[in-house]
């Protein structure tokens, strides 16, 4: 039984053309893709509530390196990369013991959800200056703006990777590896 299952899985995956990978090494469109350049290490993408913008986390680096990244969006109408302005207010959604240490980020995984209270929450896995999950309220008009609403510190020696939000504000998070390794 297991052998038949194994053969079925091998046959299934071998039917895909994995060797037909066409690398795009410049910023020129081809017959399949329209290419947009100018992003710094785009790590994760999320469609905005209006479905007219794509939120992009531009990864920087992990500690002990200190290359910071950005949160930006790609406007699907104008086809331009745009910065996201962030306003900082009191920690209302995060852990009371988590404090904003630096306004710069090294964002990784992101998730967006409309909370039970009707507000949009954007959660961002952040690697610098320390491992945190940063919580923002997202306001979308013609542009995207964020209001910092709090953070949650990672357990010691853990590197978060991605996050999945629930409507009540709780979440699931993945850990890439233990930093002691």
Question: What is each model feature region?
Answer:
Residues 34-70:
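Beta-strand-rich domains and repeat architectures in extracellular enzymes and scaffolds
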Residues 55-57, 124-125, 173-174:
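Residue position within the beta-strands of beta-propeller blades
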Residues 60-64, 117, 128-130, 178-180:
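Short glycine/acidic-enriched loop and turn motifs that connect beta-strands
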Residues 20-41, 94-95, 145-146:
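A short helix->beta-strand "capping" segment at the edge of beta-propeller domains
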Residues 41, 67, 106, 129, ...:
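Beta-rich catalytic cores
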Residues 69-116:
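Blade-loop segments of beta-propeller domains
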Residues 35-38, 85-88, 99-102, 151-156:
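Surface loop/turn motifs at the tips and blade-to-blade linkers of beta-strand repeat domains
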């Amino acid at each position: 039984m297991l052998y038949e299952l194994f053969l079925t899985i091998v046959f299934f995956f071998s039917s895909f053309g994995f060797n037909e990978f066409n690398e795009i090494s410049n910023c020129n469109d081809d017959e399949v893709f329209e290419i947009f350049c100018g992003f710094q290490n785009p790590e994760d993408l999320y469609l905005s509530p209006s479905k007219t913008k794509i939120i992009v986390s531009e990864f920087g680096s992990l500690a002990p390196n200190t290359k910071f990244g950005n949160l930006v969006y790609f406007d699907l109408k104008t086809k331009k990369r745009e910065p996201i302005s962030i306003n900082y207010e009191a920690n209302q959604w995060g852990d009371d013991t988590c404090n904003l240490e630096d306004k710069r980020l090294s964002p990784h995984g992101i998730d967006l959800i409309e909370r039970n209270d009707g507000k949009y929450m954007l959660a961002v896995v952040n690697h610098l200056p320390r491992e945190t999950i940063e919580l923002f309220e997202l306001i979308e008009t013609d542009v995207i703006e964020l209001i910092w609403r709090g953070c949650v510190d990672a357990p010691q020696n853990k590197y978060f990777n991605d996050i999945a939000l629930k409507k009540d504000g709780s979440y699931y998070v993945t850990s890439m590896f233990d930093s002691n390794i």
